[in-house]
Amino acid sequence: MATVLRIDPETLPRTLALDPPVTDAEFEEMCRGNRMGIRLERTKDGVVRMNLPTGGWTSSANAVITGQIGNWQVAHERGRAFASCVAFCLPDGSILSPDASYVSEERLKTLPKGGLRGFPRVCPDFVIELVSESDPLQKVKDKMNDWIANGAQLAWLIDPYQRQVLVFRPGRDAELISGDCIAGEGPVNGLVLDLARIWQCYED
């Protein structure tokens, strides 16, 4: 009779430092073998971060965000929008997953044929991260700065608990915005994100 190993994700460490660090190929294989719904990322220093599955509020809000960006991308017929299940191999050696993202046609053309089949070796032009209750705010802010440092032109950190958005841009301080909508610029000029629909996801 087979032995069933039961692992409580809550008891797992949040970071895993391996020596030597896992290679890109090993990390991708690790992600494919993950059966617990844990989202894995690798920092530029080779540390593997484990992010637990989200609750219903955050999952619902993610769906609303991804849907709006996807609809905008289809209407404008340019670039590609991505959901939270993708991981990008970034120039500094890290492999990170945003909650939602957009890659312009120009950057997509830098990928080799089949470059989207695995983890794309490109930094998104635009990323969104959604604060969850388990996220230390400074940790998420640091991740936003990592996106910008790797080439993102615009990054939104959405905090549904404070009902506000921190906007990150290259070479500028983060800008705090509150309200029921936020307008895109640069690579996502014309995008208007309905924040009110996101706030509603956090109401039972």
Language-model regions, residue ranges each:
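Gly/Pro/Ser/Thr-rich low-complexity, intrinsically disordered segments predominantly at protein N-termini
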Residues: M1-D204
